[in-house]
Amino acid sequence: MPSSVTRRTAFGVFGIAGISLLSACSARSSYKGKINFNSYKGITAALYKPGTEQDPPANIPEPVYYAGLNERTAEGLYKFIGFEVAYYNYLLFRGFTSPWIERGFTDSSSCPCYTTYRDISDRWLISDTYAPLTVSIMDDMPFEGPKDNTYVWTMKFEADSAARLYDKTSRRSVNLNSLNGTDTEDKGYFEYANGKWKLLSSSSLPSSWSPGKTASF
């Protein structure tokens, strides 16, 4: 686990799970704009209770991975990105370590990937929304990547200015949007393999690569 959140780690954490896409009709001609994800388990999204300096948040909704995310289309990739952003938010609430390490709340040497950063009674994320981190698509459509079955889409990673990391013991608070990589654009590098999308490390994208042919659908 890196000790700080950079543009690469912010986008790279989403990866949990052809020269062109297979022939299919795209659902729309442009995907520019903020992604809104609305597939959560049960009714927890409606019951979400924001945290305060006295109490941690409650009823944090867990995003649901559904079949449409595996479609080899621009729509499928768009939905996949939406799920990964939603899951990143979920990890922040449930205990993803990087932001807490960066701000000095947690010792990086004792935090293997995806372990919890704290006991729920000590530290938590205070946010009016259960999705304080958002991603906007900056291009109408994805571009063909440098290798077969790879695609590139420019995205902007942003954080709600009111959301903050809070330590009850020290009464210390740090705005989420102060993390490295927020309010920045980066190229999301994706591959379609074995019937699923996955996010590749942007560091593996050739430095000489530049957008060329729009992916066909």
Regions found by a protein language model. Give the residues of each.
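C-terminal motif of bacterial Sec signal peptides marking the signal peptidase cleavage site
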Residues: 23-24
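Acidic, low-complexity proline/glycine-rich segments
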Residues: 37-60
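Bacterial N-terminal signal peptides
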Residues: 15-20
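Exposed beta-sheet edge and beta->alpha loop/turn motif
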Residues: 29-41, 144-217
